[in-house]
Every structure is written in structure tokens, then in C-alpha cells.
């Protein structure tokens, strides 16, 4: 029987502690996120695969949480029910599971969309937490370490979709490298995620390919998206400016031509 729970958010491994924490939480989860669609009054049932890669039986605690996607692309989980959260729509199979060593178990997540739900995006994540372990650090001190994996769910209700406005936003230094940047505003009702076929020749004559970061742009947000540059051999490149970037940017079933100079 599914237990009515509260849910929302991302697919990242958060290791809290030091040392061999990964060995203490040897779980592999697939898929890392779900991007789904539903009608008002509809029901979705999905299965998350959890594989215990350790040599002993593992216990995982299952729960849900709301999340905040920070300006620095960090994710913060919270148990507090967020305004307009869709977590009351969600049920999960159990609060705890036991996974045999080397085995994959399936875990069901169910979303029941209310009949009167407006076009919107329901976002949530299943949190999978391992037992706390005492791990010795380099100084020989025992440190409590726990592992957590969050699996993102996006459910577009009644045709909810992103509406992106994309413009060139100059050049910014990212991790010591100057990269072209796009300004992306989402005035739609669902998240957007960019993909692109972009290329250009820089001031040194390098033939380069440009790829946007694939972080989500949530409804109502404006984010700056870097374009990483590689040579035709796939090697990371340092761009000599000015450079004109041309090609096509896509998100969902939408696409737009792009032709902009960066200096």
C-alpha cells in the first residue's frame, strides 16, 4: 500500500562527511530524474530503481522534500511544505526499504493530480538516505557520515510548458575561464533546459563548438547560462575574443536560430 507523503526535487549525491563515505553508501539510482506529463484528474505511477552495490544488506530511509534551486546552482532540500507545493498529490511505497547486496529493487512513486489542477509544473524529489556510519578521518577521529540521493520529478500538468526569452549577455569569468553567457528568462509554466548546435571561429582562427549548461530554468526565473567551448577534437578551448556564435538553440519541442557576437 502506498503511503501518502510529501515530495519534490533533484538528482544529486550529497555526501555529508569525509573519508570513505561513498563506500558506506554504495547505492546507485536510476533514472536520476523523471520528466513526465499528466492531465487533471490523472494518475502516474513510476518506479525508481535502487541498486545496493555493497557486499552487505543495506537499509534506506525514503522520504520527500521541497527544494530551492539557488542562484549558484546549489540545491537546498527542506521538509517544510512550500507555498503551492504539489507534495500532497504524491504517495510513496514505504518509508524504509531493505536492499540485498548486489541487488536492484524497484520503488514506486505515485502522483494523483487533482481534477481541478490548473496548467502548472509539479516538481518534487524522492530522497533516499542511508544509515549514519562512524567513519575515521585522517586524524583518526570517528566522524558520523550519512549519504543521501535525491531523484528529481517534473510533472507538466495540462500542457504546462516553458516560454523562454534568450539573449546574449556578454562574457563572464567562470572558474578562471572567460566564457560567453546567455540571459534566459522563463515566463512559461514549466521548466526549460537548453540544448544547442552552436559553432564559431574566434580571433585566433580556432573552429569551436559551444554548448550551454543544462541546468533547469524554472518558471518565473531569469538565469545566466554559460556556453562552454571545445575544439572540433572535443578538447576544452580558451576562446580568443571577439567571437561570433551561430547555430540553433532548442528546448523541449521549441527551437530558435542564434547569431550573436561576444567580445
Task: Give short role names for the model-derived ranges.
Residues 97-105, 214-223, 254:
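Short proline/glycine- and polar residue-rich coil/turn motifs
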Residues 19-23:
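Sec/Tat signal peptide C-region and signal peptidase I cleavage site
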Residues 141-173:
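Transition segment at domain starts
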Residues 47-49, 93-128:
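Ligand-binding face of N-terminal immunoglobulin V-set domains in extracellular IgSF glycoproteins
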Residues 24-58, 94-96, 162-181, 214:
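Beta-sheet-dominated interaction scaffolds and their linkers
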Residues 25-30, 54-108, 195-198, 202-207:
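Surface-exposed binding patches on compact interaction domains or structured appendages
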Amino acid at each position: 500500500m502506498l503511503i501518502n507523503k510529501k515530495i519534490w526535487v533533484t538528482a544529486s549525491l550529497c555526501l555529508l562527511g569525509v573519508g570513505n563515505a561513498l563506500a558506506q553508501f554504495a547505492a546507485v539510482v536510476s533514472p536520476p530524474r523523471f520528466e513526465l506529463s499528466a492531465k487533471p484528474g490523472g494518475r502516474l505511477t513510476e518506479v525508481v530503481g535502487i541498486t545496493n552495490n555493497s557486499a552487505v544488506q543495506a537499509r534506506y530511509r525514503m522520504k520527500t522534500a521541497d527544494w530551492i534551486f539557488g542562484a549558484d546552482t546549489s540545491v537546498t532540500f527542506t521538509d517544510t511544505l512550500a507555498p503551492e507545493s504539489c507534495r500532497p498529490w504524491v504517495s510513496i511505497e514505504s518509508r524504509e526499504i531493505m536492499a540485498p547486496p548486489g541487488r536492484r529493487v524497484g520503488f514506486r512513486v505515485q502522483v494523483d493530480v487533482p481534477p481541478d489542477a490548473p496548467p502548472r509544473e509539479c516538481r518534487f524529489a524522492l530522497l533516499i538516505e542511508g544509515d549514519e556510519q562512524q567513519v575515521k578521518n585522517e586524524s583518526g577521529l570517528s566522524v558520523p557520515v550519512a549519504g543521501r540521493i535525491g531523484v528529481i520529478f517534473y510533472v507538466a500538468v495540462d500542457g504546462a510548458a516553458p516560454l523562454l526569452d534568450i539573449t546574449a549577455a556578454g562574457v563572464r569569468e567562470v572558474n578562471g575561464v572567460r566564457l560567453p553567457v546567455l540571459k534566459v528568462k522563463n515566463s512559461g509554466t514549466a521548466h526549460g533546459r537548453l540544448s544547442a548546435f552552436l559553432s564559431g571561429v574566434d580571433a585566433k582562427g580556432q573552429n569551436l563548438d559551444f554548448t550551454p549548461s543544462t541546468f533547469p530554468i524554472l518558471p518565473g526565473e531569469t538565469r545566466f547560462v554559460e556556453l562552454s567551448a571545445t575544439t572540433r577534437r572535443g578538447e576544452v578551448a580558451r576562446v580568443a575574443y571577439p567571437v561570433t556564435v551561430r547555430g540553433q538553440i532548442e528546448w523541449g519541442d521549441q527551437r530558435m536560430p542564434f547569431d550573436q557576437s561576444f567580445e
